[in-house]
């Protein structure tokens, strides 16, 4: 079997259809059960998404002396909430938002070899019990979570168990009983991946130790100055009494991370730098976070989005779906992270697999997910915040990018601006800073040109696929089967707890005239089906359906 070369053909087709299709109506979403295996997770850098409160832009005396794209730029919690209220995420079919850490970051700056950098990204913690003033207040965070839940959107926090922030003149090193400051990791085996620092000047928590430790003096002094020392100590005493855990570094961290869940109703964690810690600690964290979410839901029944348990996804750098449940740390040591409390793994595969034909990718992913990984899932992406090899670095294939990401089996991670072709290269920036430009709201509003296309038209395509995906768990969670190669057509079928869902998708269709599409027995003759791409309906006849419109994609379901 030889599939047609869809990439170039669809690029031309989308170019011809974009302006017209942006105006086509889409059907209203139909309620179907949410499943994390089909989630569309919008991943954003809090500081780079939207500035909803300019009054917090100059926190802690941080200066405007950073290297290009390495300082704070104003994005905050209030900015995310504003976009939820506008309906931006709902229109895109997003049902979960993963935001970078908003806890208090180091106040100073450091240079890791790519220029002076501040902790705008959120991965350089100073105090795990407080929000960073540049990101917002607890009232603003509560409003964010409540607003998200009211709009059917879950909130995923990014958590770091591996390291503190770098040491700077303003930010002291944690005590030696808490962290190691060397050696630097060499990644040859488990020991040289875990018992080491990721880079120089990034103190590594002693997460493998069970030795009781006292609170770091700098936190004690800080909490006393802020008038909350007694409260924090009382809560810690209660935690250690309830759990029976030793007062070791990792258990303090677990308590602090779980507190955000218990207080605000956070729905899940994305775990950072997982392979650099002892695998077993994540199961312990999952237990505490699950208890915390259950407590919050009991206390806030009217605010609970559903009764699903706490969800955790793992970032094991360079994990690919083909690794399934066996990741090689080197030296003959393998780890099954899905046996350590995780429900899903971030897969680094699609950003390179997207260069392959659709059917090769879709069938391979489906086979693995419904075979070796049954009961778990992956979170696919085509670009991300620290991956220097995105699928489409120059944003020349925005429509194919959407198709490959949003139609691939598994959950989908939209990295902020994928849907608006946000640039991933900035003059003067070095390293991963290029991937972290500010969200291009101005280009979306003006419908600016991006190569052969316009930004608003690109987003309209992403939104059509996203809404279809959100309404149909079969897209990401269902079993894949090809129906035909010309045009490329496939079906996805899903069933869980007595609820079923079936869809048919066709890609690379002619934009000159309507095309008859085989539905592969998914829908019976005489059934009325809807194309979610155009909003048109048609009746199945002789196992095929023809919509009275010409669009490059058909997203077919019986609703």
Where are each of the predicted segments found?
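Substrate-binding/active-site clefts of carbohydrate-active enzymes
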Residues: 27, 33-39, 47-259, 263-264, ...
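Gram-negative bacterial Sec-dependent N-terminal signal peptides
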Residues: 2-21
């Amino acid at each position: 079997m030889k599939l047609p070369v869809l990439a170039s053909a669809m690029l031309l087709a989308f170019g011809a259809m974009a302006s017209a299709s942006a105006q086509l109506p889409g059907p209203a979403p139909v309620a179907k059960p949410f499943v994390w295996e089909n989630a569309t997770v919008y991943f954003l850098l809090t500081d780079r998404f939207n500035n909803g409160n300019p009054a917090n832009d100059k926190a802690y005396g941080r200066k405007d002396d950073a290297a290009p794209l390495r300082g704070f730029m104003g994005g905050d919690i209030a900015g995310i909430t504003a976009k939820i209220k506008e309906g931006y995420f709902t229109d895109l079919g997003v049902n979960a938002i993963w935001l970078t850490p908003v806890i208090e970051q180091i106040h100073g700056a450091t240079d890791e070899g790519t220029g002076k950098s501040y902790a705008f990204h959120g991965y350089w913690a100073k105090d795990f019990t407080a929000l960073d003033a540049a990101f917002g207040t607890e009232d603003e965070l509560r409003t964010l979570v409540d607003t998200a839940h009211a709009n059917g959107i879950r909130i995923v926090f990014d958590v770091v168990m591996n390291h503190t922030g770098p040491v700077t003149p303003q930010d002291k090193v944690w005590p030696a009983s808490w962290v190691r400051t060397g050696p630097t990791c060499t990644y040859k085996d488990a020991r040289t991946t875990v018992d080491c620092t990721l880079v120089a000047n990034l103190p590594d928590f002693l997460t493998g130790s069970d030795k009781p430790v006292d609170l770091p003096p700098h936190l004690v002094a800080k909490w006393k100055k802020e008038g909350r020392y007694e409260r924090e100590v009382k809560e810690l005493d209660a935690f250690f009494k309830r759990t029976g855990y030793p007062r070791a570094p990792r258990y303090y961290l677990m308590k602090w991370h779980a507190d955000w869940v218990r207080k605000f109703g956070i729905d899940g964690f994305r775990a950072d730098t997982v392979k650099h810690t002892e695998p077993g600690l994540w199961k312990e964290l999952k237990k505490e976070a699950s208890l915390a979410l259950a407590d919050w839901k009991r206390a806030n029944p009217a605010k609970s989005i559903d009764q699903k348990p706490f969800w955790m996804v793992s970032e094991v750098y360079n994990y690919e779906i083909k690794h399934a449940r066996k990741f090689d740390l080197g030296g003959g040591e393998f780890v099954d992270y899905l046996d350590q409390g995780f429900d899903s793994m971030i897969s680094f595969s699609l950003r390179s697999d997207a260069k392959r034909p659709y059917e090769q990718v879709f069938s391979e992913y489906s086979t693995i997910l419904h075979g070796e990984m049954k009961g778990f899932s992956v979170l696919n992406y085509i670009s991300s915040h620290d991956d220097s090899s995105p699928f489409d670095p120059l944003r020349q294939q925005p429509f194919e990018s959407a198709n490959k990401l949003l139609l691939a089996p598994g959950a989908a991670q939209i990295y902020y601006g994928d849907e608006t072709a946000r640039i991933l290269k900035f003059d003067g920036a070095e390293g991963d800073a290029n991937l972290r430009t500010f969200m291009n709201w101005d280009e979306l509003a003006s419908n600016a040109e991006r190569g052969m296309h316009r930004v608003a038209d690109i987003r309209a395509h992403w939104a059509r696929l996203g809404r279809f995906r959100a309404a149909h768990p079969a897209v990401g969670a269902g079993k894949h089967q090809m129906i035909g190669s010309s045009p490329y057509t496939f079906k996805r079928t899903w069933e869980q707890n007595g609820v079923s869902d079936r869809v048919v998708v066709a890609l690379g269709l002619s934009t000159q005239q309507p095309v008859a599409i085989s539905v592969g027995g998914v829908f019976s003759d005489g059934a009325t089906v809807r194309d979610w791409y155009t909003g048109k309906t048609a009746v199945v006849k002789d196992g095929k359906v023809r919509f009275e419109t010409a669009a490059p994609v058909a997203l077919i379901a019986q609703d």
